[in-house]
């Protein structure tokens, strides 16, 4: 309740009309990062509608407390923790399209997302493959590793990269005890044989991606 009141203070004395205008201004700032020229207004509408939907997720799952510190409710421990957290995203196939876009056009946002991934690992022992808000058993493979690697190779550094490296290595050699799509199902076969035998698992190609 106290945090809800704290969040309400961010509105100040603005009325609904002013808040709506602030929202429009913010979206224009975000979408205006890319300028497109086309004589066909429908092409412009399509592009910016798609860009708008692209940057809706991952959803920010953090806020600032009364001391001005960034905090989040951890879906993994059920407690309030310091730092960033993001949710409502699956990395298949956003690792090859959305996250490279974030690295190019919104790098400061993806630095926060990377910090949130590090917090997910520290609080749960694994990187997420599909967060909603915690680990969800509906995604296979280690696409989170691609998200982490692409951010680092794109030059992003404003987060704990060493912790994320540990998370990537761990996720390639372990399976979550309750959500077997998190981690690398079949890693024992792959590490020993270099492949996963056909009859050992369903979706045999995806777990070792």
Which positions does each model-derived feature cover?
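Second-shell loop/turn segments in exported
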Residues: 12, 34-38, 85-87, 99-103, ...
């Amino acid at each position: 309740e106290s945090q809800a009141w704290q969040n309400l203070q961010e509105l100040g004395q603005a009325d609904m009309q002013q808040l709506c205008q602030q929202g429009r201004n913010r979206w224009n700032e975000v979408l205006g990062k890319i300028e497109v020229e086309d004589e066909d207004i429908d092409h412009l509408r399509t592009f910016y509608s798609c860009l708008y939907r692209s940057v809706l997720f991952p959803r920010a799952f953090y806020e600032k407390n009364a001391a001005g510190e960034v905090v989040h409710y951890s879906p993994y421990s059920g407690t309030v923790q310091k730092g960033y957290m993001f949710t409502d995203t699956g990395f298949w196939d956003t690792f090859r399209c959305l996250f490279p876009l974030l690295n190019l056009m919104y790098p400061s946002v993806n630095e926060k997302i990377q910090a949130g991934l590090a917090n997910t690992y520290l609080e749960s022992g694994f990187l997420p493959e599909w967060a909603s808000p915690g680990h969800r058993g509906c995604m296979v493979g280690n696409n989170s590793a691609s998200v982490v690697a692409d951010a680092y190779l794109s030059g992003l550094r404003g987060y704990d990269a060493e912790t994320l490296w540990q998370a990537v290595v761990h996720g390639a050699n372990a399976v979550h005890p309750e959500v077997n799509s998190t981690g690398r199902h079949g890693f024992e076969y792959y590490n020993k044989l270099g492949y996963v035998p056909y009859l050992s698992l369903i979706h045999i190609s995806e777990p070792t991606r």
